[in-house]
């Protein structure tokens, strides 16, 4: 089981998922609360995977640096608790999930729905009465799922082409 994190400057999204893609927990929470999530899920999650910020030659602002600081805090917390920390970059996600570096949030989300949705093939969420795989997912939670899928793909878990 892994804890996949999509970090942000004030809030971060996470997915706790096993190698069979069964989701145990997910959400978007305040970064201080994410430190508690890390404590709660280790040692059950031996691996923590965090999306790492990459420089593409553009000027960045305060929020990017604050996000980088939180990545460091999450890493330190997980390592102090004995977890192995790995990182994936956004470009890795695009290539692992869509096989195209031009992919965007919408195409990544579509590929995830195509792969995992059981009956709601439009949104992958379903309804409260009939939930599908992605029931309860919001924008940043999709990004955390992309982190998890990329991690498993890079380690030979496999992925069906989009």
Where are the predicted features?
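Phosphate- and other anionic-substrate recognition elements at nucleic-acid/protein interfaces
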Residues: 1-162
């Amino acid at each position: 089981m892994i804890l996949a994190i999509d970090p942000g400057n004030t809030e971060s999204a996470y997915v706790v998922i096993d190698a069979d893609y069964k989701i145990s927990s997910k959400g978007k929470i305040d970064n201080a609360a994410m430190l508690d999530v890390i404590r709660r899920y280790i040692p059950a999650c031996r691996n923590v995977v965090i999306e790492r910020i990459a420089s593409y030659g553009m000027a960045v602002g305060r929020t990017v640096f604050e996000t980088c600081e939180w990545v460091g805090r999450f890493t330190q917390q997980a390592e102090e608790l004995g977890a192995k920390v790995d990182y994936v970059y956004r470009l890795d996600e695009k290539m692992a999930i869509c096989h195209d570096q031009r992919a965007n949030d919408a195409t990544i989300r579509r590929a995830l729905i195509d792969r995992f949705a059981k009956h709601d093939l439009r949104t992958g969420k379903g309804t409260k009465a009939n939930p599908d795989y992605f029931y309860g997912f919001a924008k940043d939670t999709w990004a955390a799922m992309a982190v998890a899928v990329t991690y498993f793909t890079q380690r030979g878990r496999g992925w069906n082409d989009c």
